[in-house]
Regions:
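Positively charged, helix-rich recognition surfaces that bind polyanionic ligands
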Residues: 1-130
Length: 130
């Protein structure tokens, strides 16, 4: 049944995550969880939602017309969400608020993409030079 398959899928996913975390820790690698929500649906270039290729589901088309691998775009977005969090975490509240005002999308991490990280990085550097 569908419910059993879903439970099995979640169990396998958790098992794989746990195995990867254990091996990473054993090798001295730091592990951090990031929300993967919408990472495949949103284009890493910031152009919005992607359209999946009906013949090859691993390919998608951005609004700009560029064709890209969905998993690669999602990987960029997942990495961006991690680095956005790490860039903002050590900052005092006033600086963080200032950056969030300049790049408002970083407030809501589930919609952050690689292009937002690039904008945030520019603004962080502008703050440092000011």
């Amino acid at each position: 049944s569908g419910k059993k398959k879903q439970k099995l899928h979640l169990w396998r996913k958790r098992d794989i995550q746990k195995l990867c975390e254990d091996r990473a820790h054993r090798n001295g690698i730091r592990v951090s969880r990031v929300s993967a929500r919408n990472t495949s649906r949103l284009a890493c270039d910031g152009s919005g939602a992607v359209v999946r290729n009906s013949e090859n589901h691993s390919l998608c088309t951005f609004r700009t017309g560029k064709q890209y691998n969905c998993d690669l775009s999602a990987t960029y977005n997942i990495g961006a969400r991690y680095f956005i969090r790490e860039l903002l975490k050590p900052l005092p509240e006033t600086e963080r608020s200032s950056l969030e005002a300049k790049v408002p999308v970083v407030k809501r991490r589930t919609s952050c993409v690689y292009a937002d990280l690039r904008k945030l990085y520019v603004e962080v550097n502008n703050l440092k030079t000011a």
